[in-house]
């Protein structure tokens, strides 16, 4: 007999793949059950609805993203390298965690209360991570910032603005080059000194 928590995790992982393939609207409980080789009733035992499963998938992917970004922040003491890696890992993670990305940025799913809460939670988390990186860099003398909170908000806003062009044009070789160029402008500016 399988452990309840492990079965919940199996449901979440299987559902994640199906939601990312077909989207929330086109995914059915039948497809989720079929992918697990179980009956729908066994899934309804753990989750009351497709919406509840989707919420669990979004929470799961949010935790994956947070873990990956936390690992980047702890990976080195060099704040410039941390910020560079943070931006790249963030963008690559969004591509892998398509359900989370769609939930956070799609207007079609805005009618779910949990989506709006997740959006706000994500924005706060990201601004805090960036603020910490900038604070660490300012404290160590790597960065010259008067207001790390405002700078974090600006970087966060710039990153959000990059998402659409980067993900719509699925040319991954260019993504790295474009991200490096943007990060270099962030670090070195465009004004001659």
Residue ranges and their predicted role:
Residues 21-25, 76, 97, 140-141:
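Short coil/turn segments at alpha/beta junctions that flank glycine-rich nucleotide-binding fingerprints
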Residues 102-106, 116, 120, 138-184:
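Hydrophobic/aromatic-rich alpha-helical bundle segments in the mid-to-C-terminal region
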Residues 56, 67-96, 152-155:
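Hydrophobic alpha-helical connector segments
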Residues 91-131, 139:
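Short secondary-structure transition hinges
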Residues 10, 18-52, 56:
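Helix-turn-helix
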Residues 7-15, 32, 57-61, 65, ...:
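Generic hydrophobic, amphipathic alpha-helix propensity
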Residues 1-6:
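N-terminal intrinsically disordered/low-complexity leader segments
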Residues 50, 57, 61-65, 86-90, ...:
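Hydrophobic/aromatic residues within well-ordered alpha-helical segments
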């Amino acid at each position: 007999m399988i452990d309840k928590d492990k079965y919940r995790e199996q449901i979440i992982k299987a559902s994640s793949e199906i939601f990312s393939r077909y989207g929330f609207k086109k995914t059915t409980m039948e497809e989720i059950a079929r992918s697990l080789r179980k009956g729908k009733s066994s899934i309804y035992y753990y989750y009351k609805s497709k919406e509840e499963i989707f919420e669990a998938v979004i929470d799961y992917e949010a935790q994956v993203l947070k873990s990956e970004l936390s690992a980047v922040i702890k990976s080195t003491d060099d704040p410039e390298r941390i910020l560079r890696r943070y931006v790249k890992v963030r963008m690559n993670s969004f591509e892998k965690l398509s359900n989370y990305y769609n939930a956070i940025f799609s207007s079609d799913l805005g009618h779910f209360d949990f989506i709006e809460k997740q959006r706000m939670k994500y924005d706060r988390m990201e601004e805090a991570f960036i603020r910490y990186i900038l604070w660490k860099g300012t404290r160590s003398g790597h960065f010259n910032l008067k207001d790390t909170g405002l700078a974090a908000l600006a970087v966060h806003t710039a990153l959000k603005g990059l998402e659409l062009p980067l993900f719509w044009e699925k040319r991954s070789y260019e993504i790295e080059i474009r991200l490096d160029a943007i990060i270099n402008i962030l670090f070195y500016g465009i004004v001659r000194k």
